[in-house]
Amino acid sequence: ADNWLRHIKDVRDRHGALLGGLADHHRLDALCELNVIEQVMHVAETTVVQDAWQRGQPLTLHGWVYGLRDGLLQDLHMVVRGTDVLDETYRAAVAEVAGRPRA
């Protein structure tokens, strides 16, 4: 089980400053959102996806999160169509999570 949880611990550590500034009841939501963003990055870096983009195949990765409280999918605006926008899209998506008002 620890191997499965290692990735979420990495996300928690990488974004510790952002998460530490949130109230306890918002921290889990933000952690889930950041995890989705990080996993889109991981998928984008796989050989299969990289090769597809190099061949010019139309392939788009999307990052969405499911809300357990409301049953709605939330678009995290982590949409990647190639390596040329990967870092910029990542930074923008993380900034959006950081700036999202949490009621």
Protein language model features and the residues they cover:
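Divalent-metal-activated hydrolytic enzyme cores
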Residues: A1-A103
